[in-house]
Amino acid sequence: MTAIYIGVMTGTSMDGVDFVAASFDPLHIHATLTLPFEPALRDELMALTLPGDNEIDRMGKADVGLAKLIGHGINMLIEQNHLDRHVIKAIGSHGQTIRHRPEHGFTLQIGDPHIITELTGIPVISDFRRRDMAAGGQGAPLVPAFHQAIFQHSTIHRVILNLGGIANVSLLPAGNPDGVYGFDTGPANILMDAWCERYTGHPYDENGNWAAYGQPIRALLERLQAHEFFSKKPPKSTGREDFNLDWLDDQLADWRNDELEYDELEDTPENVQATLLKLTTRAIKKAIYRSELDTGEVYVCGGGAYNSHLLEQLRWRLRKHHWSVQSTSVLGLSPTWVEATAFAWLAMRFMQQQSANLPSVTGAAGFRILGTITSV
């Protein structure tokens, strides 16, 4: 019978947990599910991702709470879709990243795999990032290897753009498996969602309508772009440690205190939102235009794929070199499920004892088998 792998993903946006049951060769999605975080768990996880003095007790409590939610979700996925547990070979659980510091050689994801295995009776592959980091890599992004396996084309250059909390690109040169590379370009939903929730009470800016109502603030944009991450050369990765509301508030305060740059008429929440959106699209454009790919196709996944204003702005920015911008749904995989499917694929690679990182992407010393197993 066809082997099925379950992928579980919680990203920097922290809007919930995505579950995918998939088989490969060829890719087939058997079932999907999303479970939202309980507000208390989300608050705990959010607090743990921000720099500061975080209690070990808080981390332990969140580690257990998230694992129980994941275990419950997997059982629900299996039962609601009448999947046969005997053909499910493994679960690939990314966990929630609460700290990612490649410059210091460490990354930490929580969501106890032992609890998940105990609740489901299925082996869990977890802790995917640290082996790459031990080999000198960034430990991220890991999904470009999956993008290469599923989306690379023999005659057309493609870019897979993931718009989660952080934006990252996988650059797939036509017919050149050895030429694949990718990296984080900077914040995507992580700042826009937080700013939107603060001022509107909504968890995200639906279709980018609020940002579309505003106008980017040039002086503020220049301050935001001065963050050292944007001047780094790949391989590079980032997260909530670098881009968060505290950082944004600091930049806003500096701008407001600059008598030469500050204009009170520009200082509206919707203009700040428009500025954050432009920060995202400008970094993506820079990443694509500085690549060796002259023209081709951009396919977008992640929550940002549903931000129609962002995609319109991106099409406009990439018009010069005739890049098309579409959802990965055109390629047969919904943008909602790409990352969770990638971790099902990573679980399969581990079970087959095959490498899953791309040194050209992460900067690792070589190809490595990623993850550790918690057996039944």
UniProtKB/Swiss-Prot annotation:
Binding-site positions, ATP: G11, T12, S13, M14, D15, G16, V17, D18
InterPro entries, A to Z: Anhydro_N_Ac-Mur_kinase (IPR005338), ATPase_NBD (IPR043129)
EC number(s) from the headed UniProt entry: 2.7.1.170
CDD domains: ASKHA_NBD_ANMK (cd24050)
Keyword annotations: ATP-binding, Carbohydrate metabolism, Kinase, Nucleotide-binding, Transferase
A Pfam family of this chain: AnmK
Pathway assigned to this chain's UniProt record: Amino-sugar metabolism; 1,6-anhydro-N-acetylmuramate degradation; Cell wall biogenesis; peptidoglycan recycling
Catalytic activity: 1,6-anhydro-N-acetyl-beta-muramate + ATP + H2O = N-acetyl-D-muramate 6-phosphate + ADP + H(+)
Biological processes annotated in GO: 1,6-anhydro-N-acetyl-beta-muramic acid catabolic process; amino sugar metabolic process; peptidoglycan turnover
Function field: Catalyzes the specific phosphorylation of 1,6-anhydro-N-acetylmuramic acid (anhMurNAc) with the simultaneous cleavage of the 1,6-anhydro ring, generating MurNAc-6-P. Is required for the utilization of anhMurNAc either imported from the medium or derived from its own cell wall murein, and thus plays a role in cell wall recycling.
Family: Belongs to the anhydro-N-acetylmuramic acid kinase family.
Protein name: Anhydro-N-acetylmuramic acid kinase
Native source species: Acinetobacter baylyi (strain ATCC 33305 / BD413 / ADP1)
